[in-house]
């Protein structure tokens, strides 16, 4: 008789976990633990152990769901509420490291009742392994809560997602009904929750604390493995611009559209001395940016120009970088951005797009696909955008102008974002 699925899963979980455990032992790395001094992340390298790690996570998730059964896992639970309370009331920083505190004392410091403090913390303990209760009535740290207590960036990340995104999710379907799913960034669940007609980035200009928290969260997310600018700097054949330059000079010009403070442009200029970079962004974004670039020789080949990417492009160039530009915009607005480039495009000019290329379901590991689907719903909730698949990207460029030709589209090994090379054939 063939083994049942749950026994098969348990066996495969054991096999993959053994590979991860052997790697940790061989490299004298700490074993995962919920304890206060447990490691906060996996520092694993190598394709085999990474694959085993992802497999163990996916198989464990499936086994957990099978053992629960659909009648249980379909029940809605207030899964984010306890973390939202922990974030809003900064509970983690009020629990002593390598110590404990009574619920009564903790409640007093947090400005909550003892009953609510106890219920939020105990939910977080059993559902998220955030905090522990070493003896009845007393709270101490777990690895996760200690991370929150000691790392202000992680507190920013939790606060952004739980205090800004989480309550907006409940308003998203209402926004779709109310605004007829029109794709505008100021007609979202986020807008209904915050009671504003401003898009998030406009709202942040008058809410500096939220703006700082958002910037901190985005910096954290961007620098995660596979999302840093290294993917673009190292993953694109920049030297090919020399062979196909449309410029009248010997140094190809690359315009970084929406290039923020010039970090990515400087990295490209440093890695490729043959290129000249021009960073374009809104005046408030680029003000003083060049003076803040590191004093290295490549800095002389990075210039800045105030420009709104919805306005007609004024600078003819060999290539235009659009890194994380389309990610925040619906198709109708992404088409506007592309059409604004057309006035300055010369035959053979390239668009180098660095953004998500969502694969079809089942290609990614379960953990990575879950993260992708999370981001897709977050983009809907915050700005009416979405994560585009290959066919979506091709359709977008065709809708903007049939003279755009998608020459290549790929995701570099180890990256979570892809690179599209689009040629202007006008």
From Swiss-Prot:
- Which pathway does it take part in? Secondary metabolite biosynthesis
Kind of enzyme, top EC level?
A: transferase
InterPro entries (alphabetical):
COMT-like (IPR016461), O_MeTrfase_dom (IPR001077), SAM-dependent_MTases_sf (IPR029063), WH-like_DNA-bd_sf (IPR036388), WH_DNA-bd_sf (IPR036390)
Please give the organism.
Aspergillus violaceofuscus (strain CBS 115571)
Q: Which residues participate directly in catalysis? A: 327 (proton acceptor)
Function of the molecule = The subsequent chain release by Dieckmann condensation (DKC) could be catalyzed by the TE domain present at the C-terminus of pyvA and/or the alpha/beta hydrolase pyvD, installing the tetramic acid moiety.
For this UniProt record, give its keywords in alphabetical order, as a comma-separated list: Methyltransferase, S-adenosyl-L-methionine, Transferase
What family, per the record?
Answer: Belongs to the class I-like SAM-binding methyltransferase superfamily. Cation-independent O-methyltransferase family.
**What is the protein's given name?**
O-methyltransferase pyvH
Q: Which GO terms describe its molecular function?
A: O-methyltransferase activity
Q: Which SUPFAM superfamilies match?
A: S-adenosyl-L-methionine-dependent methyltransferases (SSF53335), Winged helix' DNA-binding domain (SSF46785)
Gene Ontology biological process terms from the UniProt entry: methylation; secondary metabolite biosynthetic process
Question: Which Enzyme Commission numbers does its entry carry?
Answer: 2.1.1.-
The record's section on PANTHER family has: PUTATIVE (AFU_ORTHOLOGUE AFUA_4G14580)-RELATED, STERIGMATOCYSTIN 8-O-METHYLTRANSFERASE
Where, by residue number, does S-adenosyl-L-methionine bind?
Answer: 258-259, 281, 308-309, 323
User: Which Pfam family is one of this chain's hits?
Assistant: Methyltransf_2
